[in-house]
Amino acid sequence: MKRRNADCSKLRRPLKRNRITEGIYGSTFLYLKFLVVWALVLLADFVLEFRFEYLWPFWLFIRSVYDSFRYQGLAFSVFFVCVAFTSNIICLLFIPIQWLFFAASTYVWVQYVWHTERGVCLPTVSLWILFVYIEAAIRFKDLKNFHVDLCRPFAAHCIGYPVVTLGFGFKSYVSYKMRLRKQKEVQKENEFYMQLLQQALPPEQQMLQKQEKEAEEAAKGLPDMDSSILIHHNGGIPANKKLSTTLPEIEYREKGKEKDKDAKKHNLGINNNNILQPVDSKIQEIEYMENHINSKRLNNDLVGSTENLLKEDSCTASSKNYKNASGVVNSSPRSHSATNGSIPSSSSKNEKKQKCTSKSPSTHKDLMENCIPNNQLSKPDALVRLEQDIKKLKADLQASRQVEQELRSQISSLSSTERGIRSEMGQLRQENELLQNKLHNAVQMKQKDKHNISQLEKKLKAEQEARSFVEKQLMEEKKRKKLEEATAARAVAFAAASRGECTETLRNRIRELEAEGKKLTMDMKVKEDQIRELELKVQELRKYKENEKDTEVLMSALSAMQDKTQHLENSLSAETRIKLDLFSALGDAKRQLEIAQGQILQKDQEIKELKQKIAEVMAVMPSITYSAATSPLSPVSPHYSSKFVETSPSGLDPNASVYQPLKK
């Protein structure tokens, strides 16, 4: 088998690209695409009256059922469908409609943004806040425009299906932890048995093994890889551990043996199929550091060519097979495949080491000639790129700190505004109480004013009636006066003609009548002034009444409430009266029952006494009846009669020859 040496100096390097502009344009285009898709789906929802975003979890469910049927069999797929259907039914029955639609839509859009390569950052969080705000403020209250009965099962599936997948994920996580624990226990047992086997060897071989181990550790400078490397699933690395690979490995040699294990735990992106034992300690140290820095920048063609060369010659290029954790990209969180490779054991490592050390020194020289110029060419670029990465990390850290400070300032401002709103709420409550008190006082004043208005209207009517009556009397008085004057003139003329003596009396009478007329005119003027004043008061009261129409509405509402309360009080009093009557009737019935029971007991006692007396009478009475010989006037009495019943003890004479009952 021919050996091929990779000419590292002739490898094609990729063109340099400005990563800052590329990242900005790529991220903005990605989030603009998200916004456009979201807007189009909302528009389709509004136009067609159906929520199309609910179909995406249904499509994911169909894919997962197909994958489970293809890889895990029919039984598991049927079980998965039954569990998902049960979860959907529970969500459909027990979650209210509005909360169900809100949770389903929010989960769909949040999960859609989560499926990006960016992870959790400020744009994704802002998109999440936008989606949640739109769902809560607009679509949460507006369910009339959609077919609720058609969309509700899909909404229940959007909640039930993630719950089922979360349950399966939790189960797999628990089983993974249990498997790791079992592996650790088995590893401890294997180490214990290995120590027993080493102790069982002769002491000379034990000393030789110890010396070999010390020489290997001193020559390598880097500790050997643990045989218990964690097997990584899904072929990816978590997003929060992509940047923690370069710095711990650069400082690899400065730390002790205990810290080396912690640094290896952070290097989670190493593929298990490519872990091999190094050929030489110096060559391994140089090429490990070089390839760790350069593998971050190599494109896919370079990686493919180096992997083909590594497969053909595993000894010369064993140290080039380390892959950087930052170069591995996680495909999607839904991937179910695993990259579980075989890790070589300690015996295979020793065999490879012996094979590689047995080669001629010319191979080492060739390898140094092929790789050292490449190291000298690539180290400055790697350092520059590392410095750029460090600057980017510092800038990101500073930006995150600024965002954190802004969020804290927003939280403090929101808390202060909340306190101000609470104080304003207290003031508004106090103002509301004051306004209620003023309204109550205004209602009371309005009642008083209405009472005064009614009294004044009554007085006005009385004054108008008195005025009309006085005017009638005045007209009658004028007519009578005219008639009297006419009659007086006639009488004067007649008297003057007949007698000249009556003129003085008539003149006195005329004077008196004129004085009375003047008095009546004065009284009329006074009454007219009073009537004018009353009319002015009535006008003022009418204006006041027109201004208080709003208070009349309040009074009507208050009167209606008072009528209701009066009706309720009347009904309550009627119910209490009925209850009292029922209780009194119940007491009377109980008393009558007790009296009847007492009478029944008395009758029972009387019956018992009568039975005793009957028994005594029947015991003493002869077999034949006798007539009353001594008293012929008395009628024949029967053998037994109720008239002979006595409450006192029996007064019979036992010495009598013939028994005769005594009549009382």
Curated annotation (Swiss-Prot):
Residues 320-348 have a biased composition (Polar residues). Coiled coil: none annotated. Residues 253-274, 320-375, 630-664 are annotated as: Disordered. Residues 253-265 have a biased composition (Basic and acidic residues). GO terms for cellular component: nuclear membrane; rough endoplasmic reticulum membrane. The modification Phosphoserine is found at S305, S332, S631, S634. Keywords: Endoplasmic reticulum, Glycoprotein, Membrane, Nucleus, Phosphoprotein, Transmembrane, Transmembrane helix. Belongs to the macoilin family. This is Macoilin. Its main location: endoplasmic reticulum. It holds the Pfam family Macoilin. PANTHER family: MACOILIN. Plays a role in the regulation of neuronal activity.
